[in-house]
Amino acid sequence: MANSASPEQNQNHCSAINSSILLTQGNLPTLTLSGKIRVTVTFFLFLLSTAFNASFLLKLQKWTQRKEKGKKLSRMKVLLKHLTLANLLETLIVMPLDGMWNITVQWYAGEFLCKVLSYLKLFSMYAPAFMMVVISLDRSLAITRPLAVKSNSRLGRFMIGLAWLLSSIFAGPQLYIFRMIHLADSSGQTEGFSQCVTHGSFPQWWHQAFYNFFTFSCLFIIPLLIMLICNAKIMFTLTRVLQQDPHNLQLNQSKNNIPRARLRTLKMTVAFAASFIVCWTPYYVLGIWYWFDPEMVNRVSDPVNHFFFLFAFLNPCFDPLIYGYFSL
């Protein structure tokens, strides 16, 4: 997960090892073959996601230039711009950090970067999830309350700003709970093996459990529920319109009808939600399993563990493909 609760960190980042525990040289983590494959795939996805998201930002920039010539940038394109920025931020922070950390196994960057990068990692994970919530809410309101959305142009900007603000606030505890530890051998002598972990930051075990559940809820459960509710409301509204008059699905801008462009953005919103579920569910299922059964690390093979966690890196790669497919 985003902190020391994950089995991925337990295996590869030694985050489940407290600095007071004595280790032998043979117990220290190493870079395995499956770890090397994971690193290779991670950096490949990093290049892919960077290229896709940067290309879409350039395309949006061209639309922005057209806006200066009198063509207004649509509300949906503004939302897509911020989602792309959030995806690019996640790509540039999380993927290189994960790849390099798996290569080095231990932490060499010092305590300051341990705290700062842990904060930036969680911030860059919150931002895309919250932007997905904003898009789902905006599209739901555009269908269920079109006149209210059209008359309130500030609502979209407010939700976007709130998403960025909450991302920065909710990631704040990372600056406090992460720290460097130095592990010792069986004789008590320091071996020079250091790690960036959260151990010793929580007075009681349930404090860490609460923090883990909070981050899990904000990163996955709450966004997922909001997206499902919004998409259900959209489908219900569309079904009701079609039941009243099957010919209502016309290509005009009447408040009672659904223009084709809006239908296209609705399909894209559903595709975003599906991508979010497919990519993040394996990642969090593995994390939750570890919370309730830490010994699962010894039962789940290393390749399976790495494979499940790589799913999360597919999400920022898929989103630009979804943009392109629906040709906004």
Curated annotation (Swiss-Prot):
Tell me which Gene3D superfamilies the record gives: Rhodopsin 7-helix transmembrane proteins
Paired cysteines (S-S):
C114-C196
* Glycosylated residue positions: N18, N102
PROSITE patterns, per the entry: G_PROTEIN_RECEP_F1_1, G_PROTEIN_RECEP_F1_2
Cite a GO CC annotation: plasma membrane
* Example of a GO MF term: gonadotropin-releasing hormone receptor activity
In which tissues does this protein get expressed?
Pituitary gland.
Q: Which GO terms describe its biological process?
A: cellular response to hormone stimulus; G protein-coupled receptor signaling pathway
Query: What's this protein's function?
Result: Receptor for gonadotropin releasing hormone (GnRH) that mediates the action of GnRH to stimulate the secretion of the gonadotropic hormones luteinizing hormone (LH) and follicle-stimulating hormone (FSH). This receptor mediates its action by association with G-proteins that activate a phosphatidylinositol-calcium second messenger system.
**What is the name of this protein?**
Gonadotropin-releasing hormone receptor
| Gene (name only) | GNRHR
